[in-house]
Amino acid sequence: VNVPEPVCFVAPAGHPLADKAEVPLDVLAQQEFLLTERGMSYRDALDQRLAARGLSIHPYIELGSASLLCQMVERGMGLSFLPEYIVRPALSAGRIARLNVPDCTVTMHRQLFYHKDKWLTPQMKAFIELVNQ
């Protein structure tokens, strides 16, 4: 199983950047950020893309919980860079806005490996189905 998972920049609804058609990466790097801890795959991907352009983001909060970061963005505490599956409900409800940053797109991959010739229990089949959603 190999499912692409986009990662996106998000801002609180009503943030000045939320209405912009595009946000340049250098403008974004000047904002207050809430990010996941270093070592998480999508955080590392962001840091690498920023470094390649001579930029960096110095978050004022780093947490291990992407869900909690999304809630903090909803409450207007800053911007973040999170997997789309985490922010989708808040985006749909209009509580946060996805920022269009064309010079920094990141897609991670949700992967699950299993032996194709081995018998799969009903629980394993259900788990594979869940990962594919």
Language-model segments: what does each one mean?
Residues V1-C8, A93-V106:
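Short beta-strand->loop
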Residues V1-F33, P122:
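Flexible hinge/capping segments at coil-to-helix
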Residues C8-V10, P16, L79, A97, ...:
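Residues embedded in well-ordered beta-strands
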Residues A13, E84-I86, D103, R110:
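Short secondary-structure boundary segments
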Residues L17-A18, E32-R53, L120-M124, I128-E129:
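Secondary-structure junction motif
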Residues D19, L99-Q133:
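A late-sequence structural motif
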Residues G39-L99:
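Hydrophobic hinge/microswitch elements
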